[in-house]
């Protein structure tokens, strides 16, 4: 019954279920271990403590493996950026671009905030996968010309150095990029701009709708969907 809705949403069971759901939606598959799952632990923290849902993406948090190695701790950290600066997320989505640009990370940020969906094209052995190669007609649409130009977005993200356990990241060196009509210099300004968009609010409500109904929303349900968007803009919390 409707009278029990508030109590159910405040329960530990809801926080657990929604954290698991959102973790499955925002990741490409299961993590290697419970100590490598920052999205799940941050989502549970956000819902449990009734924090603004935007904190999931831009909040000042550090999510690191706990001492036992069987989970992760969420602590406030002014240098944090939701889960996007957690080492495990950065390594997982660092990609393999030759110069260290996080093309995979750029796509994941766009997908998780706005719902962007792309169909990857599979190259052939010997194809030029460098910056110059990506400017070929078959590639430049996604990488340079569209509003979600992956190379442009990646230029404001940290750059990967090395591979595997020795992987590190350095600050971007390309300078500000023109993205979404703004001069964007780093990952924080990028994600903040995305979270301040209608596309972000719509995508978060798409996730809510799928969690509640087990399917995507459709056009005839627009009035209910719009109420979700308005509530997220006003109340801020899930």
Name each region found by the language model.
Residues 4-152, 209-213, 217-219, 224-238:
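Extended surface/linker regions that mediate inter-domain or inter-protein docking
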Residues 125-207, 225:
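Primarily the internal scaffold of c-type cytochrome electron-transfer domains
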